[in-house]
């Protein structure tokens, strides 16, 4: 897969620590970052330092880190981590996951392999456990003075023993870190305990203050809590069926090869989000205010006094 500033690969490995850390045996996750391509606030060197410093059952583990120099002008950082088999996105997009009181569907086929791995018997137990473990991961980071700043379903994985793992500290912020605002100038009344770069987070999971780039910074820890809430809300939003052709060949292929047998496509779904970010930040802000209402005073939303 590819992120904004990185590429992620599935790599073979003989490291025994992979299994110990709940990863798929014989494989590792290899994240590669070209240090000259990354842009603020992405910082692979800080990410490595944070992964080396932190240790929690619900956070990913850094098994190794090294650099490559394919040419005199390029330095690529390589982060080796366990390859976890399930992404929360896969769970949320499953048609077998419905907010009902009856037991979850039997894990009898590949589509429901996540059920077999996670071992939950009711919808309530799945939601409760995910919430508890994600809260524990975030609480640990915040206790260490670290804000994640990109909490979303695709950054939440599950190990082979069903343990939730929060990954990707690429845009994380620390209380000891003095972040340079996009303007290049620190506000005279801004403190070092604020984060300033608002271009963090992803889509519908971004806190509303990030959409308006407050001049005096924002509370990155509160932004994490907002993201936590929007992620957990996804367990209760609508499951939408993808609009795809019912057959696996386009019309022009059917014209050229009329004798080719037609095979129906499997049904696929995706989980809607609490707020709609499909049309950009303005639409997202409007949707947030439509659901939550507008704040009635600056004390309810201090950053609002310095929106740009």
Language-model regions: role of each:
Residues 159-203:
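Activation segment/activation loop of eukaryotic-type protein kinase catalytic domains
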Residues 142-159:
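Catalytic-loop of the protein kinase fold
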Residues 285, 289-308:
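C-terminal lobe substrate-recognition/regulatory segment of protein kinase catalytic domains
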Residues 32-54:
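Conserved N-lobe beta3->alphaC-helix segment of eukaryotic protein kinase catalytic domains
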């Amino acid at each position: 897969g590819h992120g904004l500033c990185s590429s992620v690969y599935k790599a073979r490995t003989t490291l025994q620590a992979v299994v110990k850390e709940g990863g798929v045996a014989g494989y590792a996750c290899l994240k590669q970052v070209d240090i000259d391509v990354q842009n603020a606030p992405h910082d692979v060197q800080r990410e490595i330092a944070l992964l080396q410093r932190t240790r929690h059952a619900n956070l990913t583990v850094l098994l190794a880190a090294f650099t490559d120099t394919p040419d005199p002008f390029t330095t690529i950082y390589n982060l080796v981590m366990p390859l976890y088999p399930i992404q929360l996105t896969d769970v949320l997009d499953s048609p077998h996951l419905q907010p009902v009181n009856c037991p979850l569907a039997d894990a009898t086929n590949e589509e429901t392999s996540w059920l077999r791995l996670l071992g939950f018997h009711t919808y309530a137990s799945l939601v409760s456990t995910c919430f508890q473990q994600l809260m524990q991961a975030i609480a640990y980071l915040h206790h260490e003075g670290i804000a994640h700043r990109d909490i979303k379903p695709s950054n939440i994985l599950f190990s082979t023993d069903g343990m939730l793992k929060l990954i990707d500290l690429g845009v994380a912020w620390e209380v000891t870190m003095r972040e340079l605002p996009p303007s290049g100038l620190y506000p005279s009344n801004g403190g070092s305990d604020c984060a300033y770069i608002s271009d963090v987070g992803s889509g519908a999971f971004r806190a509303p203050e990030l959409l308006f780039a407050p001049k005096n910074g924002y509370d990155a820890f509160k932004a994490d809590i907002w993201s936590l809430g929007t992620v957990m809300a996804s367990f209760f939003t609508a499951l939408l069926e993808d609009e795809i052709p019912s057959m696996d060949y386009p019309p022009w292929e059917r014209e050229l090869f009329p004798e080719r047998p037609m095979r129906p496509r499997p049904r696929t779904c995706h989980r809607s989000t609490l707020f709609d970010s499909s049309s950009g930040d303005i639409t997202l802000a409007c949707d947030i205010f439509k659901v939550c209402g507008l704040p009635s005073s600056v004390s309810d939303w201090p950053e609002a006094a310095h929106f740009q």
